[in-house]
């Protein structure tokens, strides 16, 4: 007689888990929740995970194959392009085109959006292929950040599909390439974290239902820009350095890597706040809305945190007028962001 296996998972033996949840399994389980699902969204996520694996592999070999260093050009936003920036951009363009489903791609490395006319799907992806690449020479963790929009009804793929309010995203994620490769993903119903098992070649669910601590006295900001901040920002940062009544009369601790993905990932796990305010050098902010501020804000809110700009406006309520529009950002534990909002008179 055959053995029928159903119901709850079988317990693993000797501490070795044989019933792991891979990213494809996770995505398929999510798809099953929607009776009319076509599978298109699953293909979008599959294309993204392939690109993350490809970039991860390439970064680990970068020094060996002479991919570290400047490519001798600047991208549209004015950043000096590294060789890996160029290669990462190519990886994402090819992966999104090969999906057959993704119609529109916005990349930090491209001045204009890219439309794939032969693709038949209804999704747009906005990404920073390799965020923090200036840190690669020093071996600092870098990452990829991406947001996903569903195309507007009857659209064949235009700029209007992405110049939309941040809360219209259907998914957001980032991959961090460090001692291991981590993927943090939201599909709009919470946040889950995965770690790449290089032997299996699969992202494994390691941080289910990721929640940011509601309060933690840690701040992450580039204080080298203090001279260029306005008085409101400067006085707030000085305030958190003073003894805090809700932190046993101890000041905030400072933690700053200089790679947004690494700093935000630490903030997710331990709590606190991450900020990149406007300053005299960047009066409109430094971080791009579509592929940096929006996805990180979406992830943060889905994990129980908050994300606002210097004026206290919710990041996801903003609407860009250009694909490379920038913004200031304050994100992290709700308790710490509330302190900033109180400071600027925007209590929520």
UniProtKB/Swiss-Prot annotation:
Keywords for this protein: Allosteric enzyme, Carbohydrate metabolism, Hydrolase, Magnesium, Metal-binding, Phosphoprotein, Ubl conjugation
Enzyme class: hydrolase
Sequence positions that bind AMP: 27-31, 38-42, 122-123, 150
Effect on the protein upon substituting residue 2 to S: Loss of proteasomal degradation in response to shift to glucose-containing growth medium
Keyword Magnesium in record: yes
Gene Ontology, cellular component aspect: cytoplasm; cytosol; periplasmic space
Any one biological process term the GO annotation gives: fructose 6-phosphate metabolic process
Residues bound to substrate: 131-134, 222-225, 255-260, 276, 286-288
Alphabetized Pfam families for the sequence: FBPase (PF00316), FBPase_C (PF18913)
Cofactor note: Binds 3 Mg(2+) ions per subunit.
Catalytic activity field: beta-D-fructose 1,6-bisphosphate + H2O = beta-D-fructose 6-phosphate + phosphate
Enzyme Commission number(s): 3.1.3.11
Pathway: Carbohydrate biosynthesis; gluconeogenesis
Binding positions (Mg(2+) 3): 128, 131, 292
Entry GO MF terms: fructose 1,6-bisphosphate 1-phosphatase activity; metal ion binding
PTM per Swiss-Prot/TrEMBL: Ubiquitinated. Targeted for proteasomal degradation when cells are shifted to glucose-containing growth medium.
UniProt motif (Pro/N-degron) ranges: 2-5
Regulation: Subject to complex allosteric regulation. The enzyme can assume an active R-state, or an inactive T-state. Intermediate conformations may exist. AMP acts as allosteric inhibitor. AMP binding affects the turnover of bound substrate and not the affinity for substrate.
Subunit details: Homotetramer.
Domain observations: The Pro/N-degron targets the protein for proteasomal degradation when cells are shifted to glucose-containing growth medium.
HAMAP family: FBPase_class1 (MF_01855)
Name of the molecule in the record: Fructose-1,6-bisphosphatase
């Amino acid at each position: 007689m055959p053995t029928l296996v159903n119901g709850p998972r079988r317990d693993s033996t000797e501490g070795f888990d044989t019933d792991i949840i891979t990213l494809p399994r996770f995505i398929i389980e999510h798809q099953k929740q929607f009776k009319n699902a076509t599978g298109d969204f699953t293909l979008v996520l599959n294309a993204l995970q392939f690109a993350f694996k490809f970039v991860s592999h390439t970064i680990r070999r970068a020094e060996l194959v002479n991919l570290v260093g400047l490519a001798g050009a600047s991208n549209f936003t004015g950043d000096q392009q590294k060789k890996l920036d160029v290669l990462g951009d190519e990886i994402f363009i090819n992966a999104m085109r090969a999906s057959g489903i993704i119609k529109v791609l916005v990349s930090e490395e491209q001045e204009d959006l890219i439309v794939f006319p032969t693709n038949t799907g209804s999704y747009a992806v906005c990404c920073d292929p390799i965020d923090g690449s200036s840190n690669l020479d020093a071996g600092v963790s870098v990452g990829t950040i991406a947001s996903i929009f569903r195309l507007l009804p009857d659209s064949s793929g235009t700029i209007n599909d992405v110049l939309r309010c941040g809360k219209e995203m259907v998914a957001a994620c980032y991959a961090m390439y460090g001692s291991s490769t981590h993927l943090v993903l939201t599909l709009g119903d919470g946040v889950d974290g995965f770690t790449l098992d290089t032997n299996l070649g699969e992202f494994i669910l390691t941080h289910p239902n990721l929640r940011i601590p509601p309060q933690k006295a840690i701040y992450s900001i580039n204080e080298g820009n203090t001279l260029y901040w306005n008085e409101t920002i400067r006085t707030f940062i000085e305030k958190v350095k003073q003894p805090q009544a809700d932190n046993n009369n101890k000041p905030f601790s400072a933690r700053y890597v200089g790679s947004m993905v690494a700093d935000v990932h630490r903030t997710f796990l331990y709590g606190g706040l991450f900020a990149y305010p406007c300053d005299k050098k960047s009066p409109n902010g430094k971080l791009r809305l579509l592929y940096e501020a929006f996805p990180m804000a979406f992830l943060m809110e889905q994990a129980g945190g908050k994300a606002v700009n210097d004026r206290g406006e919710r990041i996801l309520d903003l609407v860009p007028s250009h694909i490379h529009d920038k913004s200031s950002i304050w994100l992290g534990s709700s308790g710490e962001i509330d302190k900033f909002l109180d400071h600027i008179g925007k209590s929520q």
